[in-house]
Structures are given as structure tokens and as C-alpha cells.
A protein has these predicted regions:
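HotDog/MaoC-like acyl-thioester-processing domains
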Residues: 3-5, 62-72, 76-152, 226-228, ...
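Hot-dog-fold acyl-thioester-processing enzymes
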Residues: 1-58, 108-217, 272-294
Length: 294
């Protein structure tokens, strides 16, 4: 694998749980991918966090260790699979001090523009150099990668789901083509969290209680990258529940078309925010989550 990114955690990247927010992990990994696009010569018309040839269709992320302000880290990348229709990329975020991985990313890109023979040749050459197998800590653990049937906004409204986000897409959430960035979809899901915490009783009018939650694993399917100004709504429910963890399902819809634009699944663990460790789900929280099981 090659190093494609090096930086440190910024204070403004910290969320209400006291650690780097998931959307910034995602954004940094996408920046690392741009290094590969540059190497391959497919970034002659740069798109922020993307390129003209490939579109991110699926992402799977494992969060292995929380990151605090000022923590230095770097990203390494390899290529898992090179096919006619898609490319699978693996990245690791590694702590500079411990040299241990703190996050693992699996990205699946699909071709949206037919590559030239030169681009194909470049990919074949670099694939031989960067071919990598996904280690056990980077593979799915609490989530299935099977495709799920789609549903409309009206179908979602008939289920045990809560409205967790609604807004129009702003310019700062878009790339230079004025289309929403993949990491902005992650941001939308993250921004919905306080509504979910309020429903489960772990946040009140005074802010956070001493109980919160942290994401251990995410899966994202991207169906459409909508343009600036698009009206989006997120419906959220619970897929499963155990003693310490639960799985959220977040469907993001285009309100105008009623079609899903992205689907996120997240394994979350209940967390004592003072001790910074996982705890069993409190009975009141478990009762609230049970009502949202799909």
C-alpha cells in the first residue's frame, strides 16, 4: 500500500460525543483516493473528492479507535479488485504515534465514463503494484453487504421510522460541479443523531446526558448525487438490537421525486461519555429503540 494522506484531527471536526465526527473520516479517505486518480491521469478535470470517470456507489467503514483533537494520523491505500464495471479500493487510517489502524475503508467505484485504452493500461499497471487483501479488521462484522430492496418515501412513512433530518442541499455540501459530495451524505446522517438521541432519552434540554453512542461500523449505498438546492428528508429506524449495540437504518429521500438517494446502515454502541467506554443499553433507551425496530 502507498501513503496518500497525512494530517491531524482538528478541533472543529469534533462532535458532541467528544471525538472526530464520522463525516471527516470519510472526507479524508476520499481525499486519499484523489491521489490515486492523479497517479492514473483521470483527474484532468478535477472534481472535489472525485473525478469525471468514477462514481462512489458503496462505502463500508470500520471505526477501530476514536480520535481526539490534535491526534496525528496518515492514510495508506491499496486496490482490492479491478473489474470492467467497478473498482474496489481499500484504505487504512493509521495513528502516527502507535502505528496502529484506527479506521478501515472499503470503497466501491463504478465507471460513469468509458475509460480510454491509456487509462485502462494505467490501472492495470498500478493494480499490480497496489493489489491488497482486506485484513480481518477491515471486513464487515456487524453489517451485511447484501443489496437491499428499495422503498419510496411514502412506503417509509408507513413504517416505524422517525423523521431525523430535513433540509435543502447547500453550496458548502457540494463539489465544484454543484452536486452533493459523498461525505455530505454522511454528514446528513450524523446531523440527524441528536434527534435520535432525544427520542431515546440520552439528550435533554440541557444537552448531552452522560450516556451517548458511537459508531463502530457504517455501510452506505449511494443511488444519486443530487444537485444544489435539492430538498432531502431522512427517515430512520432500528434494524436490530442487542445488549450493548444496535443497528440504525437511515433512508435519505429526494422529497420532490420521493425516491431514495442514499441508504446508510450503522452499528452503534452505547457509551459512557465520562468513562469513555461501552456500556449496556439502559432499559429506558432499549424500550425506545425497540419501538423503532423495522
Amino acid at each position: 500500500m502507498i501513503t496518500v494522506y497525512r494530517n491531524s484531527v482538528q478541533s472543529w471536526e469534533i462532535d458532541q460525543m467528544g471525538h472526530m465526527n464520522v463525516q471527516f473520516y470519510f472526507e479524508k479517505a476520499l481525499q486519499g483516493c484523489v491521489v490515486l486518480w492523479n497517479k492514473l491521469g483521470i483527474n484532468d478535470q478535477p472534481i472535489e473528492l472525485g473525478n469525471m470517470y468514477l462514481s462512489l456507489s458503496r462505502a463500508h467503514i470500520r471505526f477501530l479507535k476514536e480520535q481526539k483533537p490534535g491526534a496525528p494520523f496518515f492514510l495508506k491505500m491499496g486496490i482490492v479488485e479491478l473489474g470492467d464495471n467497478e473498482i474496489k479500493i481499500y484504505l487504512e487510517m493509521i495513528e502516527t504515534i502507535t502505528q496502529l489502524p484506527c479506521a478501515a475503508f472499503n470503497f466501491q467505484f463504478v465507471w460513469i465514463k468509458k475509460p480510454s485504452s491509456e487509462v485502462k493500461e494505467s490501472f492495470s499497471k498500478i493494480f499490480e503494484e497496489l493489489k491488497v487483501d482486506i485484513p480481518s479488521y477491515g471486513q464487515p462484522r456487524g453489517l451485511s453487504l447484501e443489496k437491499e430492496p428499495l422503498m419510496s418515501l411514502s412506503q417509509a412513512s408507513q413504517k416505524n421510522m422517525i423523521d431525523s433530518f430535513e433540509a435543502v442541499i447547500l453550496l458548502r455540501q457540494c463539489d465544484n460541479m454543484k452536486k452533493i459530495k459523498p461525505s455530505s451524505y454522511m454528514g446528513i446522517v450524523s446531523d440527524s443523531t441528536p434527534h435520535l438521541l432525544a427520542y431515546t432519552g440520552t439528550i435533554d434540554e440541557n444537552g448531552m446526558t452522560n450516556v451517548g453512542s458511537a459508531a463502530l461500523e457504517y455501510k452506505f449505498d449511494f443511488f444519486e448525487y443530487v444537485p444544489l438546492g435539492t430538498h432531502l428528508k431522512t427517515k430512520s429506524g432500528v434494524q436490530s438490537l442487542s445488549a450493548k449495540t444496535f443497528v440504525w437504518k437511515h433512508w435519505i429521500f429526494n422529497v420532490e421525486t420521493a425516491k431514495p438517494v442514499a441508504l446508510a446502515s450503522a452499528v452503534a454502541v452505547t457509551m459512557d461519555l465520562q468513562a469513555r467506554k461501552s456500556i449496556p443499553i439502559p432499559p429506558e433507551m432499549a424500550e425506545a429503540l425497540t419501538k423503532l425496530i423495522l
